[in-house]
Amino acid sequence: MEIEIGRGKKGRRAYGFDDIAIVPSRRTRDPHDVDMSWTLGPHRIELPVLASAMDGVVDPAVAIALGKLGGIGVLNLEGIQTRYEDPGSHLERIASLPPAEATRGLQEIYRQDVIPELIAQRIREIKAQGVLTVASLTPQRVERYIDVALEAGLDVLVIQGTVVSAEHVSSVGEPLNLKRFIADLPVPVIVGGCASYSTALHLMRTGAVGVLVGVGPGAACTTRQVVGVGVPQATAIADAAGARMQHALETGEYVNVIADGGMSFGGDLAKAIACGADACMIGSPLAKASEAPGRGNHWGMATFHPELPRGTRVRTTTIGTLEEILVGPAHENDGSLNLMGGLRNAMALCGYDTIQAFQKVEVMVAPALKTEGKRLQQSQSVGMG
């Protein structure tokens, strides 16, 4: 329903994860009977989680570890891992930068060009461990580097930018034709981000197997303040899910909706899937792992843009191992550990046994969900406080 912004402008009301609640149904289910797997092209993935293609979150070791746990780690092929043979010292420098110098320091570190040989080396390193090898490139550089990535054994390509559309217009060069490019590739492609029904639908029509949904919700992203663009995630995901339904009616093909950003706790992942997501791409929750390359830091991949940075470096507390954060066991009670356990139990409490079934769960607008009755927790900064 549209509301009046002013006499000359109307708009829709949109909702984030904190604005909504999942409603339990008349049936409950044993958590052990819940199947959280999903399909990405020809690949069956055990857990509906992808680690964001961010340098403080994923390096080859983390991608391998996540793959063995049942998820996916997306390596950024334009990041620090492909600019330096030994990125360790540069990651240490990023971690040591004072807040006032962080953006300038990142701009300097990322001034080094991407080295194609390192793209091949990193992909082969992950591939050698027998896990699904997934990596990202921007639309601006994907044609330049895709061949070396494919030759090294890339399994799934992610074409990712702040906002990616199927109809980019440019007067200064020939824009990437996504539909033609994807059709010519021998591997499945995920593309995004987007945050609206129409953009998601047109991206699905390019032949992508998945669409990333999220513009600016991430913990280290400042896009929404710098350019004022974005849509709260619950609404953005639900709109993309509507586009998926329309696309399926048109073609008979199912395209995955992947919620990208804005999730910190197990309940957030559950809400994303309840709104229509098939899987969740997360960054800051995994940046808190002891194995994360950020050394207790997390930064957006537009932070080092030379002209208009749209991200920041944030400090994250190391709260556990990658395994503990993803699948437990948890030793905290706020939902930041055992994310998949939180999702599994949400599905069980509502009586659903698959991801696609759980997308049908009832959701209501409930802005008091996280505060109702929680004054003691808030006053003591424990639990949900």
Q: Residues of each region from the PLM?
A:
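Active-site entrance/lid segments in N-terminal catalytic domains of soluble metabolic enzymes
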Residues: 1-250, 286
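Alpha/beta catalytic cores of nucleotide-metabolism and tRNA/nucleoside-modifying enzymes
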Residues: 1-26, 110-114, 118-124, 190, ...
